[in-house]
């Protein structure tokens, strides 16, 4: 395991404050990473509290195992947070969880380690998998995907306006030789982008789209939000930190839907409103952003937005 890559936790105090930690509660850190949020949660838990950390990344799991040897109240689980309901069912903890935290996106160690293949800034193997042992790598997928599929990923997940032009460039170049390195792909994408944005690498959006697709990030998020609501106890908190509009849109719509309930689907003259149609969440405060002082030490927090809700039923 590489250890030379550090990670600065975004909205550290704000996220843990939002969970309103109870000393004897059960909490889930759905995106353990390097344990920044988890360590602060443990610092506020009492002897009877428990914290489970989830992560697909083997390097993150190794860091979690080290923390588990230090603190018996902590357990690391090598699974996606999308599967947390299954894990909680197995442990008999559905409806008994006091808080769930999801800090979405890619961690700094993943971005900064060229061998993980997430970044175009440092050349490395074109992988991008958060769990290198599961699924296709980015290189493998690009070798077999159609031009239409590649364009869809660049446009819908990367919000890249030149998605088709870039996809065509990828398909044309792979006929000569396959893509195996991040720098190689970034160079082809940059050449196909006719309008470079000031201060932004022209491959940024396409790389984001490819990463999201390879790791099924949006599908996992939708499943994970439903799972979090299922496992929370009444009064339990859900805090989600997003880093781009696609993630935040899903979180915002989910919370709004659960806050509104489904009473509007019932006939207006119905004398009694069934409990199943009542709201399941209430929002806690307004969306939170990183402070100016945090941005000075961690510029990557600039796009972070946190939404918090509490379970009603």
From Swiss-Prot:
EC number of the protein: 2.1.1.199
Catalysed reaction, written as an equation: cytidine(1402) in 16S rRNA + S-adenosyl-L-methionine = N(4)-methylcytidine(1402) in 16S rRNA + S-adenosyl-L-homocysteine + H(+)
Keyword Methyltransferase on entry: yes
CC annotations in GO: cytoplasm
Binding positions (S-adenosyl-L-methionine): 35-37, 55, 81, 103, 110
Chief localization: cytoplasm
Keyword set, alphabetical order: Cytoplasm, Methyltransferase, rRNA processing, S-adenosyl-L-methionine, Transferase
Pfam family, one: Methyltransf_5
GO biological process annotation, one example: rRNA base methylation
Gene Ontology terms, MF aspect: rRNA (cytosine-N4-)-methyltransferase activity
UniProt keyword annotation of NAD present: no
Cellular localization per UniProt: Cytoplasm
Family: Belongs to the methyltransferase superfamily. RsmH family.
Role played: Specifically methylates the N4 position of cytidine in position 1402 (C1402) of 16S rRNA.
Protein name, UniProt field: Ribosomal RNA small subunit methyltransferase H
Organism ancestry: Bacteria, Pseudomonadati, Pseudomonadota, Gammaproteobacteria, Pseudomonadales
